[in-house]
Amino acid sequence: MDTFQVIILALIQGLTEFLPISSSAHLILPAQLLGWEDQGLSFDVAVNTGSLFAVVIYFRHELWAMFKAWIASIVKGQHSDDSKLAWWIILATLPAVFFGFMAKDFIATHLRNTGVIAVTTVVFGLLLWWADKMSRHDLTIYQTGWRKALLIGFAQALALIPGTSRSGATMTAALMLGLSRDAAARFSFLMSVPVSLGAAILVGKDLAESPLPIDYQALTLGTVISFAAAYLCIHYFLKIISRMGMTPFVIYRLALGAVLCGFIFL
């Protein structure tokens, strides 16, 4: 890949990973418009790692508090709001792990195409709008509970379907269950840590066994750009939804779905 392609794809990954607008839909557009080939496994690992670093550093205080409380709940039997939240995040991760393992080959073979992504981009955009308008928005992140956490986890598993958007599906479910916009977004971001870490380990294992050459300069640049874009995205997204809700992202999803449909039918 040339430098321009690295910059564009890393920006797309960083900006769309945590917005409810589907990163897979956006990665299709440059390929369609510019005729780019697949960026390769090593680059996927690099930009995903950059996004993971961004969410870990942004929420470092919350994650550290959760980790200490989680250890205390195991070792000393001391339970607190942070330890409960940590257990809920772990519980919410399980459905995606199970269904990802069981269905990854089917999804890669049958669902990773422009038609599916166009439909899911529109349908789940409408669901996000409905959830944002109908939700009570009165529960904090510490009022999630294990039942709601598990349901949000199943929504994350549903996001294995390309175009759905992991953050979009989890935020939609959280809003439907009564969480505030800020709580829904923060729970979704925290959920991304174990999922992204697990995916990075698995894909990294495949990469280590691959005989293909690695362009370390491109990977380093992609990681740095993805990190910076994702960090800024998280910061400003939390500000936007507190003032405007999810409507701007719903409108964007509908427009993006229309563009993708144009590639199919025109």
Curated annotation (Swiss-Prot):
Q: Catalysed reaction per UniProt? A: di-trans,octa-cis-undecaprenyl diphosphate + H2O = di-trans,octa-cis-undecaprenyl phosphate + phosphate + H(+)
Q: Which InterPro entries match?
A: UppP
Bilayer topology reads: Multi-pass membrane protein
Q: What is its EC number?
A: 3.6.1.27
What terms describe the molecular function in GO for this protein? Answer: undecaprenyl-diphosphatase activity
Where found, per UniProt? Cell inner membrane
Q: What domain of life does the native source organism fall in?
A: Bacteria
Q: What is its main location?
A: membrane
Q: Pfam families of this UniProt entry? A: BacA
Gene Ontology biological process terms, A to Z? cell wall organization; peptidoglycan biosynthetic process; peptidoglycan metabolic process; regulation of cell shape; response to antibiotic
Q: Does the keyword Transferase apply?
A: no
Does the keyword section mention Amino-acid biosynthesis?
no
The family this protein is said to belong to:
Belongs to the UppP family.
Q: What this chain does, per the record? A: Catalyzes the dephosphorylation of undecaprenyl diphosphate (UPP). Confers resistance to bacitracin.
- Protein name (database record): Undecaprenyl-diphosphatase 1
Q: What is the lineage of its organism?
A: Bacteria, Pseudomonadati, Pseudomonadota, Gammaproteobacteria, Alteromonadales
